[in-house]
């Protein structure tokens, strides 16, 4: 029996899909990427934006009509009602996001890095976000169990573990919080990198940044869920921080870990966003040493407060503002990549054929010569930059 996995959305969705895939393989299933060969499709969806939801719905409709004999299993952050499936029996939720986190002991081995899901759900009430509808209240995986799981990943040959969750800043178990977890994971094996997923600006972020700086094997990359540089818009979004808090987190990270990769999420065209608000976001991006950004035009999600707000910003304006932010970050990312010329970087090899991989700062890097094993960590001296990709010579 063959199973085909189709996954949309964030790292958390990917982590859950990889774990489910490993569980299926352990039970004797064979993975396939060819739709025509599949006996079962597992679609892990995403409804965070209308675009993601539409892409997911189109795929599900296509699979249902072209391969009616195959089973279809739908899970993840997807609005089942929006699918308009005429045969309800085709909808088989693979796991409820309101249950406890998975206790599977099967270790996924297909990817170059391991994904450690430490938390699920969210206690926030952001006016634009539909995720709590699917993932429920915040709950955290047991601290000791996570360390045991990380050891399994290390024993399986992984040299990078990505810490992921719905809202990492809410992690709490056995009187331990995210900074404690990062320190404990980093202490397991100096030869295994720890990469942190997105965190909210604020007190937890400041403590986590301090913990990151104390361990050389924690990747020098921080991604903040900023969303906007305007306090007025952040308040309307019900984000639990101000632009000042964003700046504090960024400046502390840059001070304690010079040269780190700094990313953020930014949204354009939130209801009521004026040119002045957008200018504040542009100013934040220019002023602070961000070198990566995920930029999204606002997408109305049915059932969220923001979907009913007045002051709607036209979709063309949302796109223009998103393009402006993208242009700003593109120039900053290129300058960031150029700053590594002549330096030595550590690369986790993802593609065995080309040797391409990623530095701890989340820059793509390719060797000029040599062959390398997937999942291995290789040190390279950067000799050239091509389209923000580092080219390097392996160190002897």
Model-derived features: positions:
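Cofactor-cradling patches in redox/metallo enzymes
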Residues: 1-87
């Amino acid at each position: 029996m063959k199973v085909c996995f189709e996954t949309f959305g964030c790292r958390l969705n990917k982590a859950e899909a990889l774990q489910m895939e490993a569980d299926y393989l352990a039970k004797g299933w064979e993975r396939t990427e060819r739709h025509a060969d599949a006996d079962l499709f597992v679609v892990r969806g995403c409804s965070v934006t209308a675009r993601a939801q539409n892409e997911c719905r189109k795929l599900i409709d296509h699979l249902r009509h072209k391969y009616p004999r195959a089973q279809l299993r739908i899970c993840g952050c997807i609005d089942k009602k929006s699918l308009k499936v005429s045969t309800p029996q085709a909808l088989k939720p693979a796991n409820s996001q309101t249950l406890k986190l998975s206790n599977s002991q099967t270790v996924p081995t297909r990817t170059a890095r391991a994904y450690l899901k430490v938390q699920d759900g969210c206690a926030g009430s952001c006016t634009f976000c539909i995720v709590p509808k699917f993932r429920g209240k915040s709950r955290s995986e047991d601290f000791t169990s996570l360390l045991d799981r990380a050891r399994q990943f290390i024993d399986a040959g992984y040299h990078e573990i990505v810490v992921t969750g719905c809202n990492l800043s809410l992690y709490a178990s056995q009187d331990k919080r995210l900074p404690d977890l990062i320190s404990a994971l980093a202490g397991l094996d100096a030869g295994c990198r720890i990469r942190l997923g997105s965190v909210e600006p604020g007190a937890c972020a400041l403590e986590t940044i301090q913990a990151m700086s104390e361990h050389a094997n924690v990747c020098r990359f921080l991604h903040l869920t900023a969303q906007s540089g305007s306090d007025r818009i952040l308040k309307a979004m019900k984000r639990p921080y101000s632009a000042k808090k964003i700046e504090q987190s960024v400046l502390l990270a840059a001070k304690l870990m010079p040269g780190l990769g700094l990313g953020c999420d930014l949204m354009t065209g939130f209801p009521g966003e004026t040119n002045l608000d957008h200018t504040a976001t542009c100013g934040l991006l220019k002023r602070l040493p961000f070198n990566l950004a995920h930029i999204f035009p606002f997408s109305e999600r049915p059932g969220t407060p923001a979907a009913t707000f007045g002051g709607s910003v036209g979709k063309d304006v949302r796109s223009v503002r998103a393009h402006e932010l993208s242009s700003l970050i593109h120039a900053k990312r290129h300058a960031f990549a150029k700053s590594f010329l002549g330096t030595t970087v550590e690369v986790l090899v993802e593609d065995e054929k080309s040797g391409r991989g990623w530095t701890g700062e989340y820059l793509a890097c390719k060797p000029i010569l040599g062959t390398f094993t997937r999942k291995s960590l290789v040190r390279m001296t950067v000799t050239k930059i091509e389209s923000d990709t580092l080219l390097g010579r392996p160190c002897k």
